[in-house]
Amino acid sequence: MAAFEIGIKQFQCSGIIFLSSCCQIPKFMKIVNLSENNTILNRFIAEIRDVNIQRDSLRFRRNIERIGEIMAYEISKELSYESVSVTTPNGISTESLPADTVVLGTILRAGLPLHAGFHNYFDRADNAFVSAYRKYISDNEFEVVVEYLASPRLDGKTLLLVDPMLATGISADLSYRALLTKGTPAKTVLACVIASQQAIDYALSHFPDDTIIYCAAIDPILNEHAYIVPGLGDAGDLCFGEKE
């Protein structure tokens, strides 16, 4: 599939030049940093960061999946609920069940283990997949290219857009814009394992006002190659091996 025709322009921050979509006025949105509370999530974050433990790709993928499961549970609190009568062997029970029609949107390839964790909990959700990758112009200059999209209609649904690393925010932004070609969701939640503060600031000015952002951790800076510091490295390579 040909690359999506999404408007981009040159963007520079901290001495790094990117290509990004046009800026808007910053706005308020709900941002949840799960690492602000001490939970078992901290163990899984520590292991995916650890240079010795992360070499075990099977364990790395499983830890990302576990983080996805925990985040899915937390994000389920943002959904709308309705009362449903359930017949038991001994009578009728009234349960509150999610009323939202959820679509799990994932950015390939690094997002697959995180997607699996979310899908373990949102097992009735439809799924959307977007390919977004960095096309380098020089060592410190790149554009994000979106070349593939498979998605159901999104009108009136709740979109959970998951990506393990929110470094610059550009991939998530362009992936979201690609998904909008399939309709406008009623609610959007952006979920990541680790975000940079720069990416959070970027999302504030590029996503709709009512977007909710969930992060397992937020790190302070990007390095000269636009990788999160301290971060964990390249999540896609750690999951699936180095790419050429």
What name fits each language-model region?
Residues F4-G7, I16-F18, C22-E244:
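PRPP-associated nucleotide enzymes
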